[in-house]
Amino acid sequence: MRLILLGAPGAGKGTQATFICQKYGIPQISTGDMLRAAVKAGTPLGVEAKKIMDAGALVSDDLIINLVKERIAQPDCAKGFLFDGFPRTIPQADAMKAAGVKIDYVLEIDVPFEAIIERMSGRRSHTASGRTYHVKYNPPKVEGKDDVTGEPLIQREDDKEETVRKRLEVYSAQTRPLVEYYSSWAKTSPQAAPKYRAISGMGGVDEITERAFQALSS
């Protein structure tokens, strides 16, 4: 099972990725983890990436594709892999296609933006313990206070509505076009293209997992 998982920030990709990887016995690969591992291992590509990152520049798509090819050749990818947050742009998807990286499925978890904003901007956390709440779906017993210590809860910068909206704008401009890219590729050349599946990311975690498993067996 060689899989790309697509979806906006806050669509629940991370949660579903864990379940999918467990079911199929495959590793979850993100470009961030991959870069860190290559830098730590001191591979030639890792050394090159470190120089670029230390200079505050962005790692090129070519280098990332080479890292991807190196990563998926490792023994833990024998049964496949799940790409989370990669490819992020059309040029990356084109580069992956040109490099002959084979993908079986592209799975999109679709959640309306307004639902994501409500989901993320309603999160509250207790910094010391890591406990998290949601003003609507999992409220604390006393508004704004941690259930155990009674200490005040905070809203993380990442969860503020303005930040969430900005991240969704970036996603719309850069990554959302991949949905069209993979769905139209699947329609025009079904033999060569990965199977494209979209599921709703609304509802309970178990329901969404069930939808994901059904989509990946069809």
From Swiss-Prot:
The protein, known as: Adenylate kinase
Residues given in the record as ATP binding sites: G10, A11, G12, K13, G14, T15, R123, T132, Y133, G203
Pathway: Purine metabolism; AMP biosynthesis via salvage pathway; AMP from ADP: step 1/1
Region (LID): 122-159
Pfam families linked to this entry: ADK (PF00406), ADK_lid (PF05191)
CDD domains, per the entry: ADK
Chief localization: cytoplasm
Keywords on record: ATP-binding, Cytoplasm, Kinase, Nucleotide biosynthesis, Nucleotide-binding, Transferase
Organism (species): Polaromonas sp. (strain JS666 / ATCC BAA-500)
Reaction equations catalysed: AMP + ATP = 2 ADP
Stored PROSITE patterns: ADENYLATE_KINASE
Subunit field text: Monomer.
Any one GO BP annotation for this protein: AMP salvage
Molecular functions (GO terms): adenylate kinase activity; ATP binding
Function: Catalyzes the reversible transfer of the terminal phosphate group between ATP and AMP. Plays an important role in cellular energy homeostasis and in adenine nucleotide metabolism.
Binding site for AMP: T31, R36, A57, L58, V59, G85, F86, P87, R88, Q92, R156, R167
Region described as NMP: 30-59
Residues forming coiled coils: none
The record's note on its domains: Consists of three domains, a large central CORE domain and two small peripheral domains, NMPbind and LID, which undergo movements during catalysis. The LID domain closes over the site of phosphoryl transfer upon ATP binding. Assembling and dissambling the active center during each catalytic cycle provides an effective means to prevent ATP hydrolysis.
Subcellular location: Cytoplasm
HAMAP family recorded: Adenylate_kinase_Adk (MF_00235)
Recorded family membership: Belongs to the adenylate kinase family.
GO (cellular component) term, any one: cytoplasm
EC number: 2.7.4.3
